[in-house]
Amino acid sequence: MRFEVAIRASQGARSYQEDAASVWSAPEGTPAAGEPTRLLAVLADGMGGHAGGAIASDAVCTGFEAQYIEQQGSARQRLKAALNAANGAISALVAVQPQLRGMGSTLVGVAFHDDHASWVSVGDSPLYLYRRGEMARLNEDHSMAPVLEKLVASGRLTPEEADDDPRRHMLRSAVVGEDLDLVDLSQSPWPLQSEDVVVLASDGIHSIADIEIARIIAAYRKDGPAATADALIAAVREANVPHQDNTTVVVVTVGA
C-alpha cells in the first residue's frame, strides 16, 4: 500500500493552541519482512491551560513517536510501549515543574503497515475510517458521552437531558502521568483497502456532524489528503460555533 498524509489545524475561538500532531514515515528501502511500519500518525489534544495543555500535547506526541520508532516487537507491543512512554513523559515534566500538575492530553496513534493498521487511543479524540461511501469511528470515546447515551437507552435520561448534561465532555481517561483508567488498543490487525481514508482528529471536529465529515471526505478524497484536510478545517470554521475549540486533523489516504 502507498500512504499520503496531511496535517491541518485551526485555533478556533481559543487564545491558544493545545493540539499537537506528528507523522513519521519509514525510510526508503525498509525491508518488508516481519511487520514493518510504513507510517506512524499521532494526535494529542492537551488540557491544563495555556501553557500546560500545549506542553502536554507536545510531550505526548514526541514521547510516543520516539518510543515507537525505537521499540522492537509487534505493532501492538510497540503501541503499548509508546503510550507508556508518552504517559511517562508527562510524569517526568510534572516532577521537575510542579506548577504543571494537572496537565494532560488525549492521544490517538495509528501505525500503518503494508496492508493493515493498528491503533491505540486514550481520551475522546476520534479515529475515523472512510471506505466506499461509508464512514465509521474506529476507536472508543472515553468522554462521558457514551455513558449518558446508555442512560438515554435505558430510559433514565431524555436525549435532551443527555445533550445538555455539563458532564458530557468530561474525560474518563487521559494521559496525565498516572495510571491510565481506560485504553483502547486494537486487538487485531485492521485490514486496509485501496482508496481508504483515515482521519485522526481532536474533538473540535465535532462542531460538524459525522454525516458532513463523510460528505467532505467523499467530495475531496480524490484531490488528496491536503485538500481533504483543508476542507474539513474550513467546514469547522464555517460552522462558526461559539467558543469553538482547537481543531486538528491528520488525513491519511491509502493507495494501491
Question: Over which residues does each language-model region extend?
Answer:
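PP2C/PPM-type serine/threonine phosphatase catalytic domain
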Residues: 1-256
